[in-house]
Amino acid sequence: RIMCQTVYYFFAMSRIDSSGKECMFTVPTGNFGDILAGYIAKQMGLNIRTLNIATNENDILTRTLNSSVHELSEVSMTSSPSIDIQISSNFERLIYDNCKDSSYIRSIMSDLNNEGKYTLKKEILDKIKQTFCSYSIHTDEVESIIKKYMQKFDIILDPHTAVAIGAAERNSSKYDVSITLSTAHPAKFKDTVSSIINNNEFVPEHIINMMKKDDNLVILDNNIDIIKNYLKENIL
């Protein structure tokens, strides 16, 4: 999945003239997968100056970059649920790439499991911050961003994209080019978005029709051969 997501960054940069320019990508993220793909693209030579980590109230990544302490807290339920997590399973991959020390990774992961936190070494954090920054955008600001972009640009954002837009606006003035990765069609979060803009006409008709269909639930035994046979007979 991360390999596929790396293509997003090359595709976006192919659409602009970025030569000699300072470029920033802002990505809404909880599990650190999509933005890790951006880091890989940068390591491959793509002209990315900064990767901006956009978080919501569940701001463990923002707090880590600001303080070096990666500490778990209670998960807050927000309008951007894909960011509502505390353990970013891909973040340790970034740490490893900036220290190349598997024993250190095992040590901090043990601290996280046993104590609920770890502290990054200064030299590792400093190296990470050469590429990454991070901003936390809360739910009330998400709502105002969705309203603003609807009124000003006639663009309907889903809540995750609004988180990213908010984070980008905090930092974009420093760069020649600012690109924000969008997450999903707003119809995926119809109830949240429609309550903010007082309109639900943005939901495509084919999705409306799909949601009217009956659910089809099949319970299978926990057996790989049974699952394979079901897929062959009913789907493939």
Regions found by a protein language model. Name each.
Residues 1-236:
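PLP-dependent amino-acid enzyme catalytic core
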